[in-house]
Amino acid sequence: VMEDCGGFAIAGNTLVWRSDADAPQRDGIKLVRCSAGTLTGLQSEHLCYGTPERGAGVTLEQCHDITIGHCQILDPQVRGIELLDCVRCQLSANSIIDRRDPPSMLQAIRLLGDCRDNLLHNNMLGGAVDQAIVLADGAATVRGNLDLDHPAD
């Protein structure tokens, strides 16, 4: 968890849940009230943070001017990325895919609350049980994403 941080860059990290089956499933990345930062080049598998109601492998709450780009978020437990009350955030060129059979990821990307002026583009998404992207009208501009479960004709 990072809270009230600004002007940061997190790059080139690997996060993999390797705990035993009885250990609490709580790993993930959570940014709260952060601004002017980047998360790039993350390689992750089986991030377990979140519940069906709230949270994701990568969760941003009340953040602005954050870029998440060129990350692989594979087999997240509930969802890949969630933004809550975020402004001017960019999710670009990420692979958010549940490869399990059967999958458990509800959504790849979800925006909730007072999100506005965000950009979701050129992401590769697949394996969502519900929908690949869930957001309210006006929460983000969405373009150029590839939904592997529903490819364009």
Locate predicted features.
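Surface-exposed loop/turn segments connecting beta-strands in extracellular beta-rich domains
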Residues: 5-8, 17-19, 34-37, 45-48, ...
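Short, Lys/Arg-rich amphipathic segments at extreme N-termini
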Residues: 1, 13, 30, 92-94, ...
